[in-house]
Amino acid sequence: MHVSLVGSEMCIRDRDINGVELSGAIKNIYSMLIGASEGLSNSKAPKEIQSKFFLNTAASLIHRSISEMVEFVSHYGGKSETVYGLSGLGDLYVSAIGGRNSLMGKYLGEGYLYKDAKETFMKNITIEGAQLAIEIGPKILQDLNPKHFPLMFGILQTICENKKLEINW
């Protein structure tokens, strides 16, 4: 990795093209799961308890998501350390705290099926994580071990098979 400052902007170069591309793509899938933690916390509990439940669940999902991303990137020829950089953890953070993927995840966490949530709340909005899930989901579900990627399998089945979200830790 090479870091240089250009004007007031920081430019980071990484030679791990596979790792950068894979991390930047699959973080969209995982950010839907992290967003689901907000939907899962919408209950009859007081707001203070809901927000703490949401944040603790989100933190747990981020931790497990990074572990799965490292294994996924390594499996497909990238370097595991790339996941901890801007294209992985950095991009996951940005997408998970307020992006379109996170918003779709919130609806999935509330119990909506993907197709219903898309049609009702996000009809003309691009959801990169869902589009990627539809494109790669069938191959991933066939080729990888669900014990190694329980979060990814859960969201892929939710999107590709239009099932209710189940998070199998």
List the predicted regions and their residue ranges.
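Single conserved hydrophobic/aromatic residue that forms the stacking wall/gate
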Residues: 1-12
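NAD(P)-dependent Rossmann-like dehydrogenase/reductase catalytic/cofactor-binding core
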Residues: 14-16, 21, 27, 32-42, ...
